[in-house]
Amino acid sequence: MIALGIEGTAWSLSIGVVDEEGVIALENDPYIPKEGGIHPREASQHHSERLPSLLSRVFEKVDKNSIDVVAFSQGPGMGPCLRVVATAARLLAIKLEKPLVGVNHCLAHVEVGRWQTGARKPVSLYVSGGNSQVIARRGNRYRVFGETLDIGIGNALDKLARHMGLKHPGGPKIEELAKKGQKYHFLPYVVKGMDFSFSGMVTAAQRLFDSGVRMEDVAFSFQETAFAMLTEVTERALAYLDLNEVLLVGGVAANKRLQEMLRIMCEDRGAKFYVPPKELAGDNGAMIAYTGLLMYKHGHQTPVEKSYVRPDFRIEDVEVNWD
């Protein structure tokens, strides 16, 4: 069985085709703003203009008649972007006369991570621009055991990068600068129970930069503080749930320093650490295709008349009836 998935919750526009064995095709055409952060209206216009050619590139590699299921990211995400993707998926499903499956974006990150790494019952640390959560499955639902109280870590990194004059996406640029950092400067460490906050830390880091602290040292201090917070709450969830696997997913999962801190923590606890390949860790169409395929095989289908977008779609809202 073969599924096509369309991802476009924010700046990434991606179409993937998968079967049970692996990724057959994956094409990307992200929206990169000329300056500043992501503008939802401009991002949605980009998606609308580029989707037809992106589909054509996919169908140059895959026979459209071989598609069994059409999946799309139903939420959470930016409303204008989600609507473009949902409209395209509906039209494609109707044209091909194939079933449609709306997929929770966060769930797709976790499931493609499990698929690619072999993790069975992990505590998942989901780190992206729009959100940051500590997730684990309990019964027939994934539950959020801790999350950001304000902005996602990816958004925090981008805000700091923009303030220092760096272009989007800022995360990779902060990572490179941090490698050259030589001095740690204090920043607010905000963990409240299992939740955490980044907005105050961003403001404090921006003030450090404005006061003349080296850009490299600001980046280093920010990463060390933020990633220590994320590692702490992940370790706490691991202990509370008595699990022995950690899965790192989302766009910020590509950060080598975050991987290193989590790996060290897991080694200290005798737990296994997993992270999917970079091309499947961030937002991508293959994760939507795979999760849509998984859902369809277990009885999930989205009627066209109920395929409305859900900008605030929570992972807990999805019933999980597969292993």
UniProtKB/Swiss-Prot annotation:
Substrate binds at Y126, V127, S128, G129, G130, D158, G171, E175, N255. GO terms for cellular component: cytoplasm; EKC/KEOPS complex. The keyword Iron applies. GO terms for biological process: tRNA threonylcarbamoyladenosine modification. It is an enzyme of class 2 (transferase). Transmembrane segments: none annotated. Its EC number is 2.3.1.234. Its main location: cytoplasm. InterPro entries: ATPase_NBD (IPR043129), Gcp-like_dom (IPR000905), KAE1/TsaD (IPR017861), Kae1_archaea_euk (IPR034680). It catalyses: L-threonylcarbamoyladenylate + adenosine(37) in tRNA = N(6)-L-threonylcarbamoyladenosine(37) in tRNA + AMP + H(+). Its cofactor is Fe(2+). GO terms for molecular function: iron ion binding; N(6)-L-threonylcarbamoyladenine synthase activity. Coiled coil: none annotated. Binds 1 Fe(2+) ion per subunit. Signal peptide: none annotated. Keywords: Acyltransferase, Cytoplasm, Iron, Metal-binding, Transferase, tRNA processing. Required for the formation of a threonylcarbamoyl group on adenosine at position 37 (t(6)A37) in tRNAs that read codons beginning with adenine. Is a component of the KEOPS complex that is probably involved in the transfer of the threonylcarbamoyl moiety of threonylcarbamoyl-AMP (TC-AMP) to the N6 group of A37. Kae1 likely plays a direct catalytic role in this reaction, but requires other protein(s) of the complex to fulfill this activity. Belongs to the KAE1 / TsaD family. PANTHER family: TRNA N6-ADENOSINE THREONYLCARBAMOYLTRANSFERASE (PTHR11735:SF14). This is tRNA N6-adenosine threonylcarbamoyltransferase.
